[in-house]
Regions:
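Conserved alpha-helical scaffold segments that buttress catalytic/binding sites
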Residues: 2-269, 273-358
């Protein structure tokens, strides 16, 4: 596909930034100048699709870009291309489809995609990129709610998850929620997700030991982050925020954990509402979140294989030898994985998910 036809350019002048600032290093799609994607590791872009929130408000992301590109690169440089703003479809469904096509093309080219939106129903576009490639996937949502919606509710930012679960063909291998708040979800929703053997992590339990969810993020194929998961006092530019939620440093730590996984293909930050921002506080936070992701991305772990010389292999026998499994420990960073034996040819399609981070 022609990337240039899927995006609108943005204004950017690299000469306005100091040496070492991201703005002097990133390759941005400006009028008449599309980035050379063969020289990029990561592509970033914005999505103005907002109809899933029943809003026609024109979203603007200049503040986020200005704050991000004013930050200095970390110890290691990541090659970044800014594709500008994804074009709006005639309907939200058209936008989802265009997003799915773009993300599938990014994956085919070996490019990681990070973008800021827009309403969270665009998560459907992230998921559809895996449906189109017939690839089973693990989804992680960092969100104060589950967004299951009501029975037969139209697809929007508050009901997108039920539509993903019901979408055919179904390639959702696992779903995990991080940072839900108990008073914002019903017991029926929790029981429903438990029946599907999905993983949900309450804000309080997550906060007591943030590192425990690192394996969950390391196992994700795509991640959808709702800014309402962050405390409204620390991120005021949100839709339907809460006085409770993740702190700025906690969400930045989750961003870094997310970047370490070798399966991850896209990361999206949703439900940004710049009109609610105060002194660019939210724009600054989002910029620093993305910076933390870039730092983690440089240390991205390579795919795990049973013959990897950097791994120590531990054989474990269970039920008096009835079952055997293996644990793998990376010698360099002490990360662990568990290998689930593939017992039949039918399960070969799930092979990428049989090394489980732990």
């Amino acid at each position: 596909m022609e990337f240039e036809l899927s995006f609108d350019p943005v204004e950017h002048n690299s000469n306005e930034f100091r040496s070492g600032q991201l703005g002097s290093l990133v390759d941005v799609y400006t009028p008449g100048n599309f980035p050379n994607l063969s020289e990029a590791d990561v592509v970033v872009f914005s999505i103005t699709e907002n109809r899933g929130l029943n809003s026609d408000e024109k979203l603007k992301f200049e503040a986020i870009r200005n704050e991000l590109y004013s930050l200095y690169q970390g110890e290691n440089r990541i090659r970044i291309a800014d594709l500008g703003t994804l074009k709006l479809g005639a309907s939200p469904s058209d936008t989802y489809q265009l997003l799915a096509d773009v993300l599938q093309e990014c994956n085919d080219r070996g490019l990681f995609a990070l973008f800021v939106g827009g309403s969270q129903d665009c998560t459907v576009g992230q998921y559809k990129s895996f449906v189109q490639s017939n690839q089973f996937c693990n989804m992680v949502a960092i969100d104060s709610r589950f967004d299951l919606g009501l029975d037969q509710q139209n697809l929007n930012a508050n009901s997108y998850l039920s539509h993903i679960i019901n979408l055919q063909p179904n390639v959702l291998f696992n779903y995990s929620n991080l940072a839900y708040q108990s008073y914002l979800v019903s017991r029926n929703e929790i029981e429903f997700l438990n029946k599907l053997f999905f993983d949900v992590h309450r804000l309080g339990s997550l906060r007591s030991n943030l590192e425990e969810v690192e394996p969950v993020l390391r196992d994700a194929n795509f991640i959808s982050l709702d800014l309402s998961a962050v405390k409204m006092s620390e991120c005021p530019a949100v839709v339907d925020g809460s006085p409770n939620g993740l702190t700025s440093d906690e969400v930045c730590q989750l961003m870094r954990y997310s970047a370490l996984g070798n399966k991850l293909q896209s990361f999206a930050i949703y439900n940004f509402n710049g009109d609610n921002d105060i002194n660019n506080q939210s724009a600054k936070l989002i910029a620093q979140m993305i910076w933390c992701f870039f730092e983690g991305f440089f240390h991205k772990l390579r795919a795990v294989t049973a013959n990897d010389e950097n791994l120590v292999k531990y054989h474990v026998s269970m039920r008096d030898g009835e079952y055997n499994t293996c644990f793998f420990k990376n010698k360099q960073n002490d990360k662990w994985w568990m290998e689930i034996p593939i017992l039949s040819d039918e399960n070969q399609k799930f092979a990428p998910h049989f090394f489980v981070p732990c």
